């Protein structure tokens, strides 16, 4: 997210605590927060999709649901053509 938008979120939060927000500012704050949260969720999802879990012996123990997502995206050498990947 653009640093200016994050600064605006913080500015609105401070103003809300000190003097309150106008109805327009409340709408702006809600939109900015939603945009921030969506970006955060997208980043976490991307990070989790890139994880490969292995046990002490080096065996892949990644949950099947995550493996399927990785197959669809071609991550970690997983392929839709190879269900064992």
UniProtKB/Swiss-Prot annotation:
Subcellular location: Cytoplasm
Residues making up the signal peptide according to the UniProt record: none
SUPFAM superfamilies noted in UniProt: YnzC-like (SSF158221)
GO cellular component terms given for this protein: cytoplasm
Sections of the chain in a coiled coil: none
Location of the region described as Disordered in the Swiss-Prot/TrEMBL record: 62-85
Keyword Phosphoprotein: no
InterPro entries tied to this protein: DUF896 (IPR009242)
Alphabetical keyword list: Cytoplasm
Keyword NAD included in the entry's annotation: no
Record family assignment: Belongs to the UPF0291 family.
Protein name: UPF0291 protein SPH_1589
């Amino acid at each position: 997210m653009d640093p200016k938008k994050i600064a605006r979120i913080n500015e609105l939060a401070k103003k809300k605590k000190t003097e309150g927000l106008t109805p327009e500012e409340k709408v702006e704050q809600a939109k900015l927060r939603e945009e921030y949260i969506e970006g955060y969720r997208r980043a976490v999802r991307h990070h989790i999709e890139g994880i490969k879990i292995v046990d002490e012996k080096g065996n892949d123990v990644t949950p099947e649901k995550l493996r399927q997502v990785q197959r669809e995206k071609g991550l970690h050498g997983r392929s839709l053509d190879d269900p064992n990947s």
